[in-house]
Each structure stands twice: as C-alpha cells, then as structure tokens.
Amino acid sequence: MVRIYCKNTGTYKEFLEGTPLLDIAPQFEFDKPYEILAAKVNNVAEGLRFRVFHNRDVEFLDYRTYIGRNFYSRSLCFLLYKATRDLFPESRMTIRRPISKGYFCSVYKNDGSFLTEEDVEVIGARMRELVDENIPFKRKELQIEEAIKIFKESGDLDKVKLLETCGEVYITCYSLGDVTDYYYDELVPSTGYLKTFGVKLCHGGILLRVPDRHHPEDLAPLHEEPKTFEVFAETHKWNWIMGLSNVGDVNESILKGNASDLIQISEALQEKKIVQIAEEIERRHNDPDNPVKLVLITGPSSSGKSTVCKRLSVQLKACGLHPISFSTDDYFVNRVDTPKLPDGSYDFDNFDTVDHEYLQKDLVKLLNGEEVEVPEYNFVTGRREFNGKNLKLGERSVLLIEGLHALNPRLTEKVPDKEKFRIFINTITSISLDCHNCIPTSDNRLLRRIVRDYLKGAFTARESIANWPNVRRAEVKWIYPFQENADVLFNSAYLVEFAVLRTHAERILATVPKNCPEYSEAHRLLKFLHYFVPVSDKEIPPTSLLRGFIGGGSY
C-alpha cells in the first residue's frame, strides 16, 4: 500500500501500489467545479495516468491553474493535428505561436493551397467527433533511435533534428488512434476532456481557440492583434530565410560552429529596427503638421525596455535629436497613498501609483517650451522631493518616457496625439521546439528575470518564480490592453537567447528546493532548457539587450 497526502483536502488515504492518479482523485472529497486535468506529485507536474508506487504528496489541478491550462492546450493541439491528418493526409501543420488568446496554426495542403472557411468548419466538426469518441492519448516510452525512425518515416524532420540534438536516451511519445506525435510535456488522459474549443480561419491558417482561464466552460474572448501578428510574420520571414524555423535547426547550426554568426545576425536585426524607429521619430519630429515631441515606451516585465530605450537614445542623437529621459518613477505618489491589494500589501503596478495629474501638468509645460523643476522620488522615505532639478526642451529635444503605464491613454491624455510616438516592446518568440510544440511567449521573459534577479542579488530563483503570477496578472490588466495602440512594436526576442540563458539559468534553477511549490516551475524550465545546445555569452556585445539580464553590459 502507498499513503497519499492530498493537498486539496489536507487528508491522507491509502491505495494499492501502482494506482493511477485518475483513480485516486475521486476518492478525495473536495470542491471540484471543473474537471481535474493534471496533478503535482511531490511538486512535479504529472498526467492523470501517472501511477503511484511510493508515498507521495499530491495536488490535483483544473484548467484554472497554469499547469492545467498547459496540459489542456497541448492536448488540444494534438487533437487538431489528428483531425487535420484525417481529412488532409498529405497536409503539413505547424503550431506557430499563442496569439489572440488562442494558437495560430498554419496548414499547407498537399497542393500548396491555403485552407478555406469550409475546410476549417470540416476540421472543427472532425475534432468534435474525436471528442465524442473519447479516444485515449496513449503514452509510450521509446528509445531515441526508434522515435527518430518513426518521425523520419512520417516526414517530421523538425522532430528528427530536435531529437538528434537533445542528448536523450529515451523519450515519451503519444499516439491518438493511428497518429504518433511528440510533446515535451504531459497530456490529458483522453479526447473527452477537450469539450471547449473553437477553430477560426486566420491568415490562411487556423486560430485554435481555448477556454477562458477563469470560466473554462466558455471560450476565451477573441482579441484581434494585427500588429502583433505582423511582427511575428516579419520575424518568421527572417528565420525562414536563414533556415532556422525551430530549435533543431538552431541546435544544428550551433553544433556546426555558427553560434557567433547567429549572435551577430540577431544583434544586427535588432539594431536595424532601432535605427528605423529613430529615423521615423526624426521624420515625424521635423514634420510641422505632425511634430513628435514625446516618445512613450512600454512593455511587459523583462522585455528589455531599459536597454532598448538607451540604444534608441543613441540613435536619436545620431539623427541630430536631443533625447531627454523622463522617469514616471519620480512621480510616484507618496508611499502612504499607494493603492493596496486585497491582502493589504502595496499594489505598485496600479495606475494610480503614479500621480498622473501632476505628471501631465509638468508634461504640458515642458512640451510648451517652459522650464520645469521636476521631482525626484526618494525610495527610502517613500516621498517625492524637489532638489533643484530643472528641465527645458530645446528645438531639437525629444522627451522619452519609459514605464509600465507609458501607453495608457490616461497618462498623457492632455498631450495631443500628433505629438506622441508610442513604442511597445515584447518578446515574440518565432522559433518553435518543433512543428507541434511552440514555445510559451512568457518563458524567455521569466528566465531573463530569474537570471537578472539572482545575479543582482535582488531575489532568489524561488522568489522570482513565486512572484511571477502577480507580475503576469499586472501585465494583463495594465500593459497588454494598450499593445495594439502602439505606432511600432519592437520584438526583443533573441534567436539564441535560450541557448545563452541555459548557461546561467541551470545552476540558478537548481537552487530551488524540491519541497516548495515553486519547484514544479523550476523543474519544468530545467527540462525545457535541456532541449537547447548551450552557447557561451562571451561573444554577446556589451550593448546587447541580453546583457541587461546576464550582466556585463555597458548601460
């Protein structure tokens, strides 16, 4: 017998050795408003078919959890692949990236044509049939050579390259009916779990819609992101030109000794984009009918806002402009007036953390050519101070505001739109592990943050992981709603950044204790990083955006 401690109930029960989690879950009585999809066993994510042979702590998870959503979405991608293969046997499907609160998938039929509305409807109907049939996702361990042979025969060369460079002896594959596929993490037990989904024709492919994270019985509301898709398409085009569509391609190139070239290309592409932005700002600044005086820069945590802002300042100077940095931090309300969260802690991400009325008053004066004494925030006392710091804009001056709320219209509502230039910085990862395993868009930002926080002595890896859900909630509420308002989106994703981050992050993630809740995420990230051939950071230049996270930068 094995003794199971259920964290959901705080109680123990005994079961026969080898009992699967699928049979254990119903024996514990707790509120289950939604179907159980996964579990954490000793703080490691496991599928419900996992069999328990030793005493363990178990926490059962539904769709409202990050792990539950990942299991569901991954399984849904396999369901889509199976339906597409059933209807269009010679087609090629690629799960490109999360977008518009779903997943964009490209599908190329054997005649080279794109999907039609009718095709998508038929695929959706076939997916429904497969759900109704409740077919199990069968898990099997294969020797790496056996798996490579299977995927060579099916023409999945992207998987072949990934498996040839991952260094594993055995891997876990899944089959759904007559289709075998590889996923880098677990799936739900069967298709019957996947009741809520939608498919929609999107840019010649499919937008796979997933449930709402708070109300899994409903689809997540559709949120169009045309500018984000445009940036993704541009980055994907460059990757295609270089022959680097997935991690296997990148690993193969690194193993051939091309890491230095990949670093230089990544740097050149980012600098080219910064130059283009600077030149557009100069053009707008010189336009008497559209005179840009204020540049607003924002983006989610660890997107590289500060470094991009500094590099943009250099290029603006090269254009003959005089950039002046203007920090919203200096306009924080006094700490005693800071909004609070329900638990009583300070909500530093709240829009009202900034005294936006006072900030706008100074902005209007500055943009009208007046001299203004600006405050400086004392983070020790938690109060604004005036220390004789005066600002005045000259004829060639441009004011740069970089901050969490920079694109929130309320922050600069008294400034005419024609005087603003809005930049949104994000990490839009365009390579995938393989054609059916896209990389979560927030993983590189989380890894950047973990490494930076640790190297600067600000937080341990455990603390950074623990705080990440709060960071993400703030981004969803305060930052992403204004992404499509930007004049330009800058993609700060770096072609070999996971390979570089691996050399720093592995030892840092290894410090997370196994007996804490954050271990499950540390374990997942370590497993994920193992797919990348490591690259030394010695050739990353001091001005690189990555240096802001791994250290050794000149800014």
Features from the language model and the residues they span:
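Conserved NTP phosphate-binding and transfer environment spanning the P-loop NTPase/kinase superfamily
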Residues: 285, 409, 413-555
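Conserved lysine of the Walker
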Residues: 305
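Short beta-strand-centered segment that lines the nucleotide-binding/catalytic pocket of NTP-utilizing
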Residues: 318-336
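Hydrophobic anchor at the beta1->P-loop junction of P-loop NTPases
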Residues: 295-297
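Glycine-rich phosphate-binding loop used to anchor ATP phosphates in small-molecule kinases
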Residues: 360-417, 468-482
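Auxiliary tRNA-acceptor-end handling modules of aminoacyl-tRNA synthetases
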Residues: 50-69, 83, 92-100, 104-272, ...
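Hydrophobic positions on the alpha1 helix immediately C-terminal to the Walker A/P-loop
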Residues: 308, 312
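Conserved nucleotide-sensing/catalytic segment adjacent to the nucleotide-binding pocket
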Residues: 333, 337-380
